[in-house]
């Protein structure tokens, strides 16, 4: 499952090991259980959504030896304990939360994305963790549209990772919008056919599922590629979503 944590490749490229997990406000798990589950993956950064407020994220980090956490202030749809957070092995240089709410039928609000900039092996990476509403039928409204058109174009960091619960499948208009704005899903590099997999509902696998709605993207301008990754299949699910992970390798110079 890869070599170490934050260690350069022989060619000088920088591997960044990341994961995304919707923990359903911790209903079916504890932060300690989540930390133990993630241990084998030797992650650099984790993006959580539907995460409880307070020290929940930091407690996961305590298990993993990841000391730096940031929790946003906007809870999805104003529900209790549905925040977005970032857990990192390396210190943050900057953190911010961007609101993504829209006036649109069939859309819950508020929605947001949290961002942190950190250096992995001396190289700055901007990391976005989100939870947004499905917006399959529209190209110019919706949370994904605001993300792709208003937030990400302002990013100055050369290496960018965007992940979380998108509530959209690859091929949906919302996902196409993100990809056309210069982002690539790790599934494509890994040659994983997401139409044959699902990340929701992990607790009711026998029911009709929503397919893969949790994704990891990186900016194509960085010339990165995905070395490893996939959906983490748990015998005893810790949430209604499955966690997803990837090792993204960035060239030293984009």
Regions found by a protein language model. Give the residues of each.
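Active-site neighborhood of phospho(di)ester-bond hydrolases with catalytic His/Asp-centered motifs
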Residues: 46-49, 71-73, 161-165, 185-189
């Amino acid at each position: 499952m890869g070599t170490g944590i934050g260690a350069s490749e022989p060619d000088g490229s920088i591997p960044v090991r990341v994961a995304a997990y919707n923990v359903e406000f911790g209903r079916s798990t504890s932060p300690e259980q989540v930390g133990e589950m993630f241990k084998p993956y030797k992650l650099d950064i984790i993006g959580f959504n539907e995460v409880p407020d307070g020290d929940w994220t930091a407690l996961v980090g305590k298990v993993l030896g990841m000391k730096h956490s940031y929790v946003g202030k906007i809870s999805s749809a104003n529900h209790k304990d549905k925040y977005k957070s970032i857990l990192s092995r390396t210190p943050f240089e900057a953190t911010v939360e961007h609101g993504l709410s829209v006036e649109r039928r069939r859309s819950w609000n508020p929605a947001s994305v949290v961002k942190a900039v950190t250096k992995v092996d001396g190289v700055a990476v901007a990391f976005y963790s989100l939870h947004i509403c499905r917006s399959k039928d529209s190209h110019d409204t919706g949370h994904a549209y605001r993300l792709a058109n208003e937030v990400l174009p302002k990013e100055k960091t050369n290496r960018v990772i965007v992940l979380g619960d998108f509530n959209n499948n690859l091929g949906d208009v919302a996902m196409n919008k993100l990809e056309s704005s210069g982002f690539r899903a790790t599934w494509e590099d890994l040659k994983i056919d997401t139409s044959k997999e699902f990340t929701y509902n992990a607790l009711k696998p026998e029911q009709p599922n929503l397919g893969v709605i949790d994704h990891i993207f990186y900016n194509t301008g960085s010339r990165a590629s995905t070395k490893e990754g996939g959906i983490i299949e748990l015998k005893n699910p810790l949430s209604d979503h499955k966690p997803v992970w990837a090792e993204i390798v960035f060239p030293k110079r984009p």
